[in-house]
Each structure stands twice: as C-alpha cells, then as structure tokens.
C-alpha cells in the first residue's frame, strides 16, 4: 500500500469512493467541482494502482483544521488504513499553521482512539457551519464533534 498526496487525476476516484459512503448517509457528499478545488487537502491510499481510501485536512480558521472525507473501501475496514491517513493529516497540520484539528463524525470512538476529545458543536466557529446549513439533516444530523490539540 502506498499513501501520497492526491493529484487532479485522482479526483474522479475520490469522488466515487465518497459517493458510495454518502449514499449510505455516513459522509457528506462532495461535488466534483469541490473536490477539484480542494484536491491539495487530500491524501489517498492506493494498492496496485487503485485508490482504496482517502482523507482530507481542510483549513477552517486561524489555527483550526478539519479532518473530513475520510473513507476506506469497506472490505479493508479494520486494517489501520484510516488511522494512517489521519496520522498523516495530523503530521501535515503544523506546516499549515494548524494546531487544533476537529472532526464531525458518526464514528466518535475511532477519533477518540486517536486522542480526540468530544466537544459541543457550538464550540466550533460559525464558519464551520456553512456546509451544515445546506445539509438535509441539519440541524439534527447526529454527528459528534471532536477536537485534538497538536
């Protein structure tokens, strides 16, 4: 398995992976335009030239970043791929001037295992809510907010 920064040629494969999980309502859908605009935020994992997982670190505010669009092919769950991707995002964060990283997730125990602490969503800056407001599940999505200082 190889993990690297995403390139524009990877976007269609990232899109398909995210589309699968958004159809199951466990991730927010991302448009192709949004993915192309934010391709530099993404790390991907590939095996034999095929993208099997992705994760992005998105800069949100001053020193605050968000882990988002974390997806691993279902048949590969439990193999530590998601942890490796999040660890790379956390390692990359200080280079961007980010020292607090949050996630909004339906799988809080995964992030707690990586040292994230649960917080009330209201503690996050209002800028974070720009995507939430357009979500069909807003305001009762059930996602849990977690944060980690690095």
Where are each of the predicted segments found?
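Active-site rim helix/loop that mediates acceptor-substrate recognition in acyltransferases
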Residues: 18-51
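Conserved glycine-rich acetyl-CoA-binding loop
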Residues: 50, 73-84, 96, 113
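Conserved acetyl-CoA-binding loop-helix of GNAT-fold acetyltransferases
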Residues: 78-91, 103
């Amino acid at each position: 398995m190889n993990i690297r920064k995403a390139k524009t040629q990877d976007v269609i494969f990232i899109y398909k992976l995210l589309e699968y999980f958004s159809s199951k309502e466990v991730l927010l859908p991302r448009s192709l335009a949004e993915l192309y605009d934010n391709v530099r935020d993404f790390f991907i994992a590939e095996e034999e030239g095929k993208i099997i997982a992705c994760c992005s670190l998105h800069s949100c505010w001053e020193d605050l970043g968000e882990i988002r669009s974390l997806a691993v092919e279902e048949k590969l769950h439990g193999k530590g791929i998601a942890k490796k991707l999040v660890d790379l995002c956390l390692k990359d964060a200080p280079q961007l001037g980010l020292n607090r990283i949050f996630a909004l997730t339906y799988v809080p125990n995964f992030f707690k295992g990586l040292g994230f602490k649960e917080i009330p969503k209201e503690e996050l800056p209002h800028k974070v809510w720009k995507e939430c407001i357009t979500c069909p599940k807003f305001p009762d999505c059930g996602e849990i907010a977690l944060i980690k200082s690095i």
